[in-house]
């Protein structure tokens, strides 16, 4: 009898342990797969591609790669003497046409005062037409002067905002063309996180919800707030042929990969460039409020930690 009870007890304990283990594994799996989190997140920032508006030789480079610069600080300078001469030439043209316009204005005024009693109507009209032509030439010369002045000002390339110079690839003596990107500027205090959430987890993601961001390779947890969720992503399963007909890719009905949707998260505190734009992180959306770690069970703490490793 005792042997039977002992065997029954062992069997019952084993069954209970198996059931508990199954429940724990099931809960862990649900928590792992359905809670709003992702390891596919990246730090991002506002980046300005700086390109000159004029062409010419670079005469001076005032910054070095990865330098923190202030708004308005000179980055590099392009061939100012050439554009200074162009401005002087345009100013000389303006001065010439101003004198010529004054002369033609006086001539036309004199003929208009004398009238047809002293000369023919054709001569009066001709003087007025010449005056109008000179005035148009003067306006054109003034526009050319203003453009030359603008070009001269734009030979000095300045930082459009506070930030870090990155990927600087210009050097003194190098010829640069108008519109070619010379350097990128990562704006200071513009960092945010783009978390690519699976569509199955978007139920728990709403603007205003709190989020935890853990940079890859770091134990530091940053706080943030969900700013927005992308309104759409590219449909990779459907394209159009050259006749405009829809082309649908074949797929396996029992294998469906969840689409990833970008979620923008604003950081509570800017971290400067400790984690540069493009580096990866793990993001957990905790809901309307921050997670209270003191209330977490051992299981939840382990689950949060395991998510760092995928």
Curated annotation (Swiss-Prot):
GO terms for cellular component: plasma membrane. Keywords: Cell inner membrane, Cell membrane, Membrane, Transmembrane, Transmembrane helix, Transport. The chain crosses the membrane at residues 12-32. Pfam families: CusB_dom_1, HlyD_D23. It is a single-pass membrane protein. It comes from the Bacteria. GO terms for molecular function: transmembrane transporter activity. Induction: Positively coregulated with aaeB and aaeX by AaeR. It is found in: Cell inner membrane. Forms an efflux pump with AaeB. Belongs to the membrane fusion protein (MFP) (TC 8.A.1) family. This is p-hydroxybenzoic acid efflux pump subunit AaeA. It comes from Escherichia coli O8 (strain IAI1). The gene is aaeA.
């Amino acid at each position: 009898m005792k042997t039977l009870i002992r065997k029954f007890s062992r069997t019952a304990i084993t069954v209970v342990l198996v059931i508990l283990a199954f429940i724990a594994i099931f809960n862990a799996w649900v928590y792992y797969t359905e809670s709003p989190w992702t390891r596919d997140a990246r730090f991002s920032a506002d980046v300005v591609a700086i390109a000159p508006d004029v062409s010419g030789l670079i005469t001076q480079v005032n910054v070095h790669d990865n330098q923190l610069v202030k708004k308005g600080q000179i980055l590099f300078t392009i061939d100012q003497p050439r554009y200074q001469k162009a401005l002087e030439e345009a100013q000389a043209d303006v001065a010439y046409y101003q004198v010529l316009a004054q002369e033609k204005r006086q001539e036309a005024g004199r003929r208009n005062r004398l009238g047809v009693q002293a000369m023919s109507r054709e001569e009066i009209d001709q003087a007025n037409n010449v005056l109008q032509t000179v005035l148009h030439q003067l306006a054109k010369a003034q526009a050319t002067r203003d453009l030359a002045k603008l070009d001269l000002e734009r030979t000095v390339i300045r930082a459009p905002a506070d930030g870090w110079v990155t990927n600087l690839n210009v050097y003194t003596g190098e010829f640069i063309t108008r519109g070619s990107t010379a350097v990128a500027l990562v704006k200071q205090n513009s960092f945010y996180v783009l978390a690519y959430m699976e569509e199955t987890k978007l139920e728990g993601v709403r603007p205003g919800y709190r989020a935890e961001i853990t940079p890859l390779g770091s134990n530091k947890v940053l706080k943030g707030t969900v700013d927005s969720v992308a309104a759409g992503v590219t449909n990779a399963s459907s394209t159009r042929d050259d006749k405009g007909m829809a082309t649908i890719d074949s797929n396996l009905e029992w294998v469906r990969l969840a689409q990833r949707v970008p979620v923008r998260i604003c950081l509570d505190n800017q971290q400067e460039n400790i984690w540069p734009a493009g580096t990866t992180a793990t993001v957990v959306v905790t809901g309307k409020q921050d997670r209270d770690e003191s209330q977490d069970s051992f299981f939840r703490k382990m689950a949060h930690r395991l998510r760092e490793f995928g």
